[in-house]
């Protein structure tokens, strides 16, 4: 259960309270009440604590609209976590800049069939209550952990992203829906994100300058100068330019967006990558959260 909880919860919300309660509470997810929050704010989720169920279980509280999610699709969601015993709120992601994502995969189905079944068929606007039993203690000295109630709101349902073809990239570029990369006189990049435009659903590879060296394969080791920004706020989270040297890495050992985005490019190529969350850091890595933008100069291919 800890495995699936780590899939759903950002690290900041992987909290476990250990307080107890002797009051009479609820034993039914139907007793949960929800009051919508303001735009960009979490809803108010109430229940009679302690909430006590025999097993982990999930239930759709509110039906959304649109096509229901099918196996293999990705769900983008926001969530709120509460201690099921005390009712204390542990954290929420509604007020954050980006959605969380999870794939309706066989691994997910095996790890938690109850939640998988609740998310299968869900659509944007669906609200799901998920009661999570704590993991078994790993030692006799480990403190007892309380169950949690997670409340999820489905934001979007998406097919697994793919690498966009040249026609799609050209169309998005012509419509002004792609980020613009500018280099200063020292060759250091900055980005301008199109105002009011959402990140593309698919992986975008926009070649700025084509090289004429060796072509990269999925198993190549490459050296590159690069910078990365979050689509949501345009915040730079990493840059080899600030470190003053290119970085070497194997293409089969990086995020999927880099592997698929750089494979086939030639040494010397300069490129902009727009990478959807599902092909980047699904649960975030430091400040690299959500959909990402990279500028990459491929300086060496081995």
Segments (PLM) and residue ranges:
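Cross-family detector of peptidyl-prolyl cis-trans isomerase
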Residues: 2-302
């Amino acid at each position: 259960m800890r495995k699936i909880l780590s899939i759903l919860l950002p690290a900041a919300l992987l909290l476990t309270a250990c307080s107890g309660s002797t009051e009479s509470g609820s034993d039914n997810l139907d007793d949960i009440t929800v009051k919508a929050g303001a735009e960009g704010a979490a809803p108010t989720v109430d229940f009679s604590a302690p909430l006590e169920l025999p097993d982990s279980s999930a239930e759709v509280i509110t039906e959304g609209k649109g096509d229901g999610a099918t196996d293999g699709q990705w769900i983008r969601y926001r969530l709120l976590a509460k201690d099921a015993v005390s009712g204390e709120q542990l954290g929420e992601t509604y007020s954050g800049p980006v959605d969380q994502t999870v794939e309706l995969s066989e691994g997910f189905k095996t790890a938690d069939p109850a939640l998988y079944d609740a998310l299968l068929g869900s659509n944007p606007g669906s609200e799901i209550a998920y009661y999570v039993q704590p993991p078994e203690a790993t030692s006799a000295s480990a403190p007892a952990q309380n169950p949690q109630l997670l409340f999820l709101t489905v934001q979007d349902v998406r097919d697994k992203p793919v690498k966009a073809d040249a026609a799609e990239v050209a169309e998005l570029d012509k419509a002004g829906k792609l980020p613009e990369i500018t280099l200063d006189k020292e060759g250091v990049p900055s980005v301008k994100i199109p105002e009011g435009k959402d990140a593309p659903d698919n992986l975008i590879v926009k070649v700025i300058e084509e090289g004429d060296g060796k072509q990269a394969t999925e198993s190549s080791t490459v050296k590159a100068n690069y910078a990365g920004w979050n689509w949501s706020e345009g915040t730079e989270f990493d840059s080899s330019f600030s470190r003053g040297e290119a970085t070497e890495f194997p293409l089969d050992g990086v995020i999927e967006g880099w592997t698929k985005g750089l494979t086939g490019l030639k040494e010397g190529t300069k490129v902009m990558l727009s990478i959807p969350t599902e092909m980047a850091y699904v649960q975030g890595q430091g400040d690299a959260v959500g959909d990402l933008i990279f500028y990459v100069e491929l300086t060496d291919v081995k």
